[in-house]
């Protein structure tokens, strides 16, 4: 969890206030990745949690040599231990997100079906290009994921149309729709699959997982 808000941590049922070590210690290299891993109640899902100290990590890393590569170095030993390693990033383009992009094999870009999301998309894609050029030439864009879609809203439909018009080959076929059960699940510390596997939100994310796995299978 590379987001100081720690939503991925709490959403997996972990008490953020009780976290003693996590991504902060990992990036400071005071703990190894294996020392910071927590096993969650979701089958086959572990997490390196975030906690409040992560807010300060960008200031503390700024003067360090090769500061953009701290995460890549820290998680390198885990790559053969897991099928997938997901890095949840904050909705900002600071040093923490730069570390995640430098460490990643590919990036999935969520786009809320709202007006300002389109402005942020251009900035993010430019950042990704810079990372590819300077820090991580092997970084691929896995795809653009449209989220919080409501078919009843004109704006939602306009955003989908604009994104597909300009980035058609990059957009996932799966669209994550607005769903009450999706909003409720994190407050119970459960994934949407565990909370309500029959919900529209669960179906959307299962479709995304299948699409992602199929795409990777085709490119291997």
Regions found by a protein language model. Name each.
Residues 2-220:
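P-loop NTP-binding core
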């Amino acid at each position: 969890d590379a987001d100081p808000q720690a939503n991925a941590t709490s959403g997996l049922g972990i008490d953020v206030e009780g976290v003693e070590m996590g991504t902060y210690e990992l990036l400071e290299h005071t703990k190894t990745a294996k020392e910071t891993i927590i096993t969650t109640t979701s089958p086959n899902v572990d997490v390196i949690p975030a906690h409040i100290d992560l807010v300060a990590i960008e200031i503390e890393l700024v003067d360090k040599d090769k500061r953009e590569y701290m995460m890549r170095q820290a998680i390198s030993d885990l790559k053969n231990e897991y099928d997938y390693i997901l890095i949840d990033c904050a909705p900002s383009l600071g040093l923490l997100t730069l570390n995640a992009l430098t460490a990643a094999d590919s990036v999935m870009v969520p786009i809320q079906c709202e007006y300002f999301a389109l402005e942020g998309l251009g900035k993010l894609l430019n950042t990704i290009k810079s990372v590819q050029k300077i820090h991580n030439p092997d970084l691929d864009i896995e795809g653009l994921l449209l989220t919080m879609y409501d078919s009843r809203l004109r704006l939602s439909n306009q955003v989908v149309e604009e994104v597909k018009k300009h980035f058609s080959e990059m957009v996932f076929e799966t669209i994550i729709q607005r769903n009450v059960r999706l909003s409720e699940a994190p407050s119970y510390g459960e994934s949407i699959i565990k909370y309500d596997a029959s919900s529209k939100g669960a179906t959307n994310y299962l479709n995304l997982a299948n699409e992602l796995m199929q795409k990777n299978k085709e490119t291997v």
